[in-house]
Design a protein with these regions (language model features):
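Glycine-rich flexible loops
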Residues: 2-261
């Protein structure tokens, strides 16, 4: 069962720059399958997906199995009942559909990175645009601090990750980074929670679009000091990811209530 973070009651003293104590909840209890379906549709509605491409896996148990989307459904279509479960080798053990042939991207990365409970992969437009020319976006806005020292480029494109050996090789090149642009391909984003994974993924394309527009201007962005980037990254992870997720799911349930079915 997906456990929504506890919401404490409001106290009389002001927050004063700290973490808010009372924030609006999702308002419904979600199973893990429902939460993952909400992740697919939220990211799709935000322009993160490319038609039927892309996959998200969630190691929601400690038995090596993964929740994953079925092959052939667009992210906008995924409902909770469509979500599949595969074992550590990508064999479907629950669900009515087959899964992506590129599941080795996920299985091998999960093996190498126990902290990466959620792995998101797709080809959002502006990420892919910069990936096509092998350029990492510069941090030119405070939200870009989310990726400070946590964004890298795998500069060689080896085609489809169609077997475990290629998956292991990619996992080695990804290393400990949580946000990796794959040259001529797309993005892999990881996190230890579904909330943070979706927030990182949902924010990356705007980050890349801003960098692209700055390149078009032909001007260098104003520098943001390292100490400020570090503080902003901490604040975004601790204070923004959870409330982004709750708000995104609330909005989704108003427009796409069938996502829970």
């Amino acid at each position: 069962m997906y456990d929504e973070p506890a919401v404490a009651g409001r106290e009389s003293d002001p927050v004063g720059g700290g973490k808010p104590r009372a924030t609006p909840p999702i308002g419904v209890d979600l199973t893990n399958e429902q939460a993952l379906a909400c992740a697919f549709r939220t990211l799709a509605h935000g322009g993160f997906s490319e038609n039927m491409a892309g996959h998200i896996t969630w190691a929601d148990r400690d038995d090596g199995s993964l929740l994953i989307n079925p092959w052939g459904l667009w992210w906008e279509e995924v409902s909770a009942s469509d979500v599949c479960r595969v074992d550590a080798d990508g064999v479907v053990i629950e669900g009515k559909w087959d899964v992506t042939p590129a599941y080795h991207i996920h299985t091998e990365l999960h093996r190498r990175r126990p902290d990466a409970r959620v792995v998101v992969h797709n080809h959002p437009y502006y990420v892919t645009l910069l990936a096509a020319v092998g350029v990492l976006p510069m941090i030119a806005h405070q939200t870009g601090s989310l990726y400070d020292d946590d964004l890298s480029l795998v500069s060689e494109y080896d085609g489809e990750v169609g077997d475990a050996e290629l998956g292991r090789d990619l996992a080695v090149r990804i290393g400990e980074c949580n946000n990796v642009i794959l040259a001529s391909h797309g993005i892999i984003t990881t996190a230890d929670t579904i909330e943070l994974a979706v927030y990182r993924a949902a924010s990356i394309d705007r980050f890349c679009r801003l960098a692209y527009d700055i390149l078009l201007l032909g001007r260098d962005p104003l520098p943001i000091e390292k100490s400020i980037r570090v503080a902003m990254q901490k604040a975004l992870v601790e204070r923004a990811a959870g409330v982004y997720w709750a708000g995104a799911v609330r909005k989704l349930l108003r427009t796409d209530p069938d996502v829970l079915h």
